């Protein structure tokens, strides 16, 4: 049974999340069941979640617009953003999104705040899982909350006009067009000229033997 790229991505991501849940990172633990409602959209692309890929080129920016709602019973503060990018084909991390401090943005109970995170995608061509994190401070504890992942695809770089491969293709196409034009227009013209020479009259007239005709039809001299 063959898995599609999306199915492989989901399985790979679940594997990573389970591994993180088993291994805590000090006081910055991944709490997948934290009572926060965190959604985001990509301003450059439509967020497809795990159902479709967001397509980028290497070096593009992905600007994530977050909406954070606090459903805990205490006030909290959003203090940082981070995450990771997972390589679907190699089943390993492709890049870490360096944790960056924001705010702190204080969020009351049942309160909502919005913020942005710009991620520069320096990746090779291929399929990846983007897994953003939000760092939240609750009382004296800082927790790393894993948000919903999204699939991203890095497209092959556009071919430059001066790329040797592109120039070779242009030369081959030019040679084919020239050969086609030659055999289509010039060859028939030359052949027609030779045939015309063969058919050109030389000025002589051959007489028809009319001796077999009846006497009344024979041409009188």
UniProtKB/Swiss-Prot annotation:
- Renumbered to this chain, region (Disordered) spans 193-221
- Which superkingdom heads the taxonomic lineage of this protein's source? Eukaryota
The principal localisation class reads: endoplasmic reticulum
Asked if the Swiss-Prot or TrEMBL record annotates the protein with the keyword Transmembrane helix, the reply is yes
The residue ranges for the Cytoplasmic side of the membrane come to 187-221
Q: Give the Lumenal membrane side ranges.
A: 20-165
| Signal peptide location | 1-19
Transmembrane stretches, start-end? 166-186
Question: Can you quote a single GO CC term?
Answer: endoplasmic reticulum membrane
Question: Where in or outside the cell?
Answer: Endoplasmic reticulum membrane
Recorded hits in Pfam families, A to Z, give: TRAP_alpha
- What kind of membrane protein is this, topologically? Single-pass type I membrane protein
Task: Could you list this entry's UniProt keywords, alphabetically sorted.
Answer: Endoplasmic reticulum, Membrane, Signal, Transmembrane, Transmembrane helix
Xref: InterPro entries: TRAP_alpha
Describe the task this protein carries out: Is probably involved in a pathway contributing to genomic integrity.
The family note in this entry says: Belongs to the IRC22 family.
Name listed for the protein in its UniProt record: Increased recombination centers protein 22
């Amino acid at each position: 049974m063959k898995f599609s790229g999306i199915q492989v991505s989901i399985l790979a991501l679940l594997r990573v999340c389970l591994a993180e849940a088993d291994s805590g990172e000090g006081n910055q633990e991944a709490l997948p069941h934290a009572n926060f409602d965190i959604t985001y959209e990509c301003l450059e692309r439509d967020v497809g979640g795990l159902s479709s890929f967001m397509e980028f080129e290497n070096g593009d920016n992905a600007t994530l617009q977050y909406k954070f709602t606090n459903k805990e019973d205490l006030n909290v503060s959003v203090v940082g953003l981070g995450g990771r990018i997972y390589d679907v084909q190699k089943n390993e991390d492709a890049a870490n999104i360096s944790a960056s401090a924001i705010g702190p943005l204080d969020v009351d109970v049942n309160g909502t705040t919005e913020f942005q995170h710009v991620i520069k995608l320096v990746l090779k061509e291929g399929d990846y899982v983007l897994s953003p994190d939000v760092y939240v401070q609750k009382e004296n504890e800082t927790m790393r909350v894993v948000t919903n992942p999204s699939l991203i695809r890095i497209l092959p770089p556009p071919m430059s006009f001066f790329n040797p491969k592109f120039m070779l293709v242009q030369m081959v196409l030019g040679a084919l067009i020239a050969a086609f034009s030659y055999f289509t227009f010039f060859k028939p013209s030359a052949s027609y000229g030779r045939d015309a020479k063969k058919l050109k009259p030389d000025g002589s007239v051959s007489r028809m033997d009319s001796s077999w005709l009846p006497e009344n039809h024979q041409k009188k001299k």
